């Protein structure tokens, strides 16, 4: 059974979100229309504002409404001399939530994937290299995902960064805190053994 074209359009738009299938999209649309019209209107306004006003930081490429994000605008963060390279703005939030990093970021907005047409230019690596030349960078921390593409991207960036005489490090990978060994896959266990530290 078809509903009004506007309801169908709303369901189709919600289906475009990651992880939202047809049934979930229908439930969300009906909930907004049946019970939460104020929430729906607020969602529409927030979505419109974000799509119109949120862009990318000119320095690190994360999301911001300004030309520079608050982290890049902070002299204290820049003075650390450390840049952490991540794949997505969500990675910045995850690291910031930990509260253990006080440097700046560089967001790739993806990873190298020649089959998908994603090369160094699409990742903004010329801007990263410009930072290595002009900013007082002492260390580059590569925090790309532990995937084949993430590892290839990290190696490519490390090769590029070696020309600039900075310390290059890669975040550790292995058994999560609170994880039980019997549930950890063999690749993660191998990484954990290879990356072990002395006590």
Swiss-Prot record:
Question: Which SUPFAM superfamilies does the UniProt entry name for this protein?
Answer: Recombination protein RecR (SSF111304)
Task: Supply the Pfam families for this chain.
Answer: RecR_C, RecR_HhH, RecR_ZnF, Toprim_4
Fetch the InterPro entries from UniProt.
DNA_Rcmb_RecR, Rcmb_RecR, Rcmb_RecR_Znf, TOPRIM_dom, TOPRIM_RecR
GO term, biological process aspect, one: DNA recombination
A GO MF annotation of the entry reads: zinc ion binding
Q: Where are the zinc fingers (C4-type)?
A: 57-72
Gene3D superfamilies xrefs: 3.40.1360.10, 6.10.250.240, RecR Domain 1
Which UniProt keyword terms apply here? DNA damage, DNA recombination, DNA repair, Metal-binding, Zinc, Zinc-finger
Whether Zinc counts among this entry's keywords is yes
Q: Provide the Toprim domain boundaries.
A: 81-176
Q: Return the similarity comment.
A: Belongs to the RecR family.
State the HAMAP family in the record.
RecR (MF_00017)
Main function: May play a role in DNA repair. It seems to be involved in an RecBC-independent recombinational process of DNA repair. It may act with RecF and RecO.
Report what the protein is called: Recombination protein RecR
């Amino acid at each position: 059974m078809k509903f009004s074209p506007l309801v169908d359009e709303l369901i189709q738009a919600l289906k475009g979100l990651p992880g939202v299938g047809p049934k979930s999209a229908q439930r969300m649309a009906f909930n907004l229309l049946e019970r939460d019209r104020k929430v729906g209107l607020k969602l529409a306004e927030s979505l419109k504002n974000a799509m119109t006003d949120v862009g990318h930081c000119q320095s690190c490429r994360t999301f911001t409404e300004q030309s520079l994000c608050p982290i890049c605008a902070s002299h204290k963060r820049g003075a650390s001399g450390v840049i952490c390279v991540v794949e997505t703005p969500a990675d910045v939030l995850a690291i910031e939530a930990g509260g253990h990093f006080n440097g700046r970021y560089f967001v790739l907005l993806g990873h190298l994937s020649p089959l998908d047409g994603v090369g160094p230019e699409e990742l903004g690596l010329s801007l990263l290299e410009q930072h290595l030349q002009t900013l007082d960078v002492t260390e580059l921390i590569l925090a790309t995902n532990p995937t084949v593409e993430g590892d290839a991207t990290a190696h490519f960036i490390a090769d590029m960064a070696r020309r600039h005489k900075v310390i290059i490090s890669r975040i550790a990978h292995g058994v999560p805190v609170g994880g039980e060994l019997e549930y950890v896959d063999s690749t993660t266990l191998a990484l954990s053994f290879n990356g072990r530290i002395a006590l």
